[in-house]
Amino acid sequence: MAACKQEDNKKVFTRNDIKLESDTLTPEALWAMGRIGSYATSPDGSKVAYQVTYYSVEENRSNTVIYVQDIPSAAASESDAISSGTLLGLGNSPVWLDENRIAFLSKGEIWTMNSKGKSRKQLTNTDGSVDGFLFSPDQKKVVLIKSVPFHDIIAERPADLPKSTGLVINDLMYRHWDHYVESIPHPFVLDLESGEELDILEGQPFECPMEPFGGIEQIAWMTTGDVQDSNIIAFTCRVKKGLAYSISTDSDIFLFDLESRDVKSAKNLCKPGTTFGDAVAAAISSPIGDIDPSKTLRDQTVNSSENLANNPGYDQSPKFSPDGRYVAWLSMQRDGYESDRQRLCVCDLQSGEKRYVTESFDSSVDDFVWGDDSNTLYFIGVWHATVNLYRTSLEGQVTQLTDDQADWGSLQLIPRPTPNPSRNGGEKADADICTRLLMERHDYFHPADLYQVRVIGDSVAESSRLTAENDHILSQLASGSCEPRWCKTTDNQQLLYWVIKPPHFDSSKKYPTLLFCEGGPQSPVSQFWSYRWNFYIMASQGYVIIAPNRRGLPGFGQEWLEEISGDWTGQCMLDYLSAIDDACDSLPYVDRDHLGAVGASFGGFSVYYLAGHHNKRFKCFISHDGAFNLEAMYTETEENWFSNWEYDDAYWNRDRTPAADRTYKNSPHLAVDQWDTPILCIHGEKDYRINATQGMSAFNAARMRGIEAELLIYPDENHWVLKPQNGILWQRTFFAWLNRWLK
């Protein structure tokens, strides 16, 4: 067993009482904001424990602390509902063990404390660091997520050369997102009475949760109403490695009986009649089957109509119904397509029947939770550029419950309080008669706060804010405004774009204007809040922003979503130009002589492409982590299923499809001879999704052609910019470049 670990004695950062010199949002004010993370309701529904991360720019680091706050049981006005949470101290990932005890992570172990932050005790004492945890219903066991060594692809260093840094690699997926893969996560079950640990995937070279972003939500304990039954676990796993992993998104949900201790007997809920052992055998005997790894899986046998019934796409995030009869999970239909429509699948564990209960919602389900009747599910998803709350029955009757110009985030069911037959002369409490959900909400001008949402009747939900984490900063700022606008595209479709206006907006003036190019390429331009691509701070610097929901974005139906794959430089680029041209023609405050185009990832690719095809519309460009040379990108990226699906074919195939031929012939690097506009290129050298050589190549090409250009390179950042001082440098460089050319 590992030695007891002391909690961190470093200076603890808490809420920053920054006093602003003006009402303009600055990078420093943005990084002074607290960021609400995971949260959990108490078993009686009266309190919420939640984490907030604070940053110190001076020390260039962050810490996360836990608060507890009351949840009103009855309808309350927002001013009455908001209260200051009680700070409990350092920690993250809080969960309630009972009405008074909270478990949380600190320094790689599980700790407990009471609801006032006192009596802090280390609960686990395990080898390795715990990255996530989930208690069994009877709280006698807990699943721990820990990393185990993995050397199937990167060889172990020779024992006599312990300081060598070279890596001997024999297959693909040797690096993922921002790290070389020399360990993978496994789920362990710890018996809290005996101290025994069981690695569910012991000896298996497969991940659970799935990298790089999967967490404890990919694992669930069965609930049956009998808290003594704590032996069944559902877990998510992609039973593949190396080349097979790199070209496939096929993950499954497995049902593991802890009493058997044999993961190979775990039932595969996605592929009925098979087990985890069957998947392992297939992974060994025929890792890729008859798949051609240099072509899209779109038309290969794995996605034939016969195979689609076996869920060959992403399946993840299982959740059992309260009565234990059903398990639901998020499911994509096709293998190799990471942006397929994510549906809500429900499996009846008694009959084995699977059904999809969100088919009438022509967009993706982002998150969901069971209602306490085991017949209702609540979910969130994007539609027409906002993320709202919906409800579905087991028969697939979908009802929209909120209709806000905002994005609602992850959701939890607030338990009903202990029954009390009568209050106030026989009238039942509000919490007794309605479903209550705990959710987070944000929009372009407000970072995330927690809300209580009360579902009343068939189609109405009312919300009240519980936290006001950053009101002390927001109250010092002048807010901008935004509005949706529709325009006609070149193929006579209707396109929605957001118009974001600066604070103190004066309609009689003209403003420099930015075209925002979204990434993904299938990520929504909804009411997101970002600490980098933040429309509030852009508007505060005096810019109007035009943010189109171009072809390829979710929330406008599957046909609209799929019109981008294999056509990166086609209609989606015309949609960008339709939006900015409509804004210039219809909005008198848009200064057509001072336009810029900015974007990241696919948005950065879009900027590189527009640089050679904009017909002098724009006066400057900014590309962050964008793809520049698609032939190089095809084999540089680590998740090859992405380039296969999006490009349609490998660049070396003589029989490549017309879509692939069009993709490579229109790669931005082939139009550098048409570049004529200043460009800022930004890239992180730990970005293994789109390698930094892409940004360097674009910058080098621009300078060799005599074009004004700058390169902001981060040796220690990935696809994102995560460190405080790097983030502020990013914002300063971003606006210095825009101001130089547009003001």
Regions found by a protein language model. Give the residues of each.
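Cap/lid segment of the alpha/beta-hydrolase catalytic domain
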Residues: 241, 469-593, 600, 635, ...
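Hydrophobic or amphipathic alpha-helical targeting/insertion segments
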Residues: 104-154
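Predominantly five- to eight-bladed beta-propeller fold
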Residues: 10-13, 63-64, 147-193, 197-203, ...
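Beta-strand-rich domains and repeat architectures in extracellular enzymes and scaffolds
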Residues: 28-64
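Short loop/turn segments that connect beta-strands within beta-propeller blades
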Residues: 71-74, 114-118, 192-195, 258-261, ...
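Active-site-proximal cap/loop segments of hydrolase catalytic domains
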Residues: 539, 547-743
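Conserved beta-propeller blade repeats
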Residues: 33-48, 85-103, 127-142, 174-180, ...
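Short glycine/acidic-enriched loop and turn motifs that connect beta-strands
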Residues: 54-58, 149-152, 240-243, 333-337, ...
